[in-house]
Amino acid sequence: MGVCGSLFLPWKCLVVVSLRLLFLVPTGVPVRSGDATFPKAMDNVTVRQGESATLRCTIDNRVTRVAWLNRSTILYAGNDKWCLDPRVVLLSNTQTQYSIEIQNVDVYDEGPYTCSVQTDNHPKTSRVHLIVQVSPKIVEISSDISINEGNNISLTCIATGRPEPTVTWRHISPKAVGFVSEDEYLEIQGITREQSGYYECSASNDVAAPVVRRVKVTVNYPPYISEAKGTGVPVGQKGTLQCEASAVPSAEFQWYKDDKRLVEGKKGVKVENRPFLSKLIFFNVSEHDYGNYTCVASNKLGHTNASITLFGPGAVSEVSNGTSSRRAGCLWLLPLLVLHLLLKF
């Protein structure tokens, strides 16, 4: 529905209106392309939603009557306003130009507008099309999501605007390169922990700055012990065993020795836990403290463990995590042993 499409004049004016404007309703001869005669309206007028649109019609002194219409609805006839919409105002009515303005334009104002004139010969009309552009707007987007590693996810971003906006998805990550999807829907099969983070939806149509919204994707996975560090400490000194684990949600840590759990508050020993790191601290190491300790990291998706050794000076340490092991010892003795055997023979 165009400007004033639902408004009516008082009944007292109806008959007079019909008689005065009978010749103006577009039954006149349309002005053909390239016709140099009047009236001559503007080319298509393009404005943004909320702006004002000016419709101009070039005429000359042969015109006896003139009017602007929106489809079959009369907006102005001469200096008389036939539309009750306060947004429509007369700008000029001279011997050379007849112009109106539509203020605070909205999408329902879009459509054809006709400049109709009466001369001594016959009515003529000229038409202009009003195009209303609308800034992009994201009307629907997925909520933040938490999902287990290996599952599939689908993200949605619906945007409106005129012209229809282009929607793109991008993974906000140092490892992500460019756009991951140029569509309203982003689907990820078998998601990995590296694909967690923020996903940015952008809607653009060159009418205004792109509109951007973000969705946070949290990928849950079981603990993985990335570092388990043993240490050699003399008796009477302070020693620390460290166990670092990556997990979402964050891992909970427990320490064991000889299948017995070490609890907080044991004399001379302190367990210090952080979201991804646990420390077993000995304030005054004794001979009894030496040996293998087991760090267990767990969350709701699983658990893992690593064996860590507290040893004295010159002893060999072993740290095992799954199938991997690391040994540190007196490897400098090996070349001397080989040299001794060669000299013997």
UniProtKB/Swiss-Prot annotation:
This protein's name: Neurotrimin
Membrane topology, as annotated: Lipid-anchor; GPI-anchor
Disulfide topology: C57-C115, C157-C201, C243-C295
Organism whose genome encodes this protein: Bos taurus (Bovine)
GO cellular component: plasma membrane; side of membrane
Job of this protein: Neural cell adhesion molecule.
Protein's GO biological process: cell adhesion
Subcellular location: Cell membrane
Lipidation sites (GPI-anchor amidated asparagine): N321
Record-annotated Ig-like C2-type domain positions: 39-126, 136-218, 222-309
Record has Phosphoprotein as a keyword: no
UniProt cross-references to SMART domains, sorted A to Z: IG, IGc2
Alphabetically ordered keywords of this record: Cell adhesion, Cell membrane, Disulfide bond, Glycoprotein, GPI-anchor, Immunoglobulin domain, Lipoprotein, Membrane, Repeat, Signal
Gene: NTM
Residues with glycosylation annotation: N44, N70, N152, N284, N292, N305, N321
Protein family (similarity comment): Belongs to the immunoglobulin superfamily. IgLON family.
Main subcellular location: membrane
Propeptide segment residues: 322-345
